Amino acid sequence: MRVIFLALLIARKEGKGDENTIIKMALAHDLPETRTADLAYVHKVYSQTDDMRAARDLFAGTSFRDFENIHSRYEKRDCVEAKIVKDADNLDIDLELKELEEQGHKLPAKWKAMRKFVRDKKLYTKTAKSLWDKLQKANVAQWHMEANKWKKIPSAGR
């Protein structure tokens, strides 16, 4: 769900893309992985999946046949909507890593250089790069601490 909102944010900040297509693409972008698995980077070096076939099989004979084409466009990155959704998908990974880092996990530190490479070489939009930069300095739990009902409602929890 977060990918959808990130994609819409990027599209609106960039002033580009059809929002209807972006929403559908963001909904469908990972669905074939329910059949092929979400392979980690190292697994992709040694394994191949056929996400296009998985999408075709997944949507065939359903009311969502149009999603096969939407997924195909996403995989090809041949339109601005696909690039926006891919940027959102990458930012979602970075948000998850930031959340893990703030929980004390060590994995995010190990991925820092690789994710910086993704920021510099793989993100398509200026907005996504700007959001990535801001995320590195952000406290992802700050909203929760500031909106905490214990602060706003003095009698809460008594």
What are these regions (language model features)?
Residues 1-158:
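Alpha-helical, largely C-terminal catalytic domains
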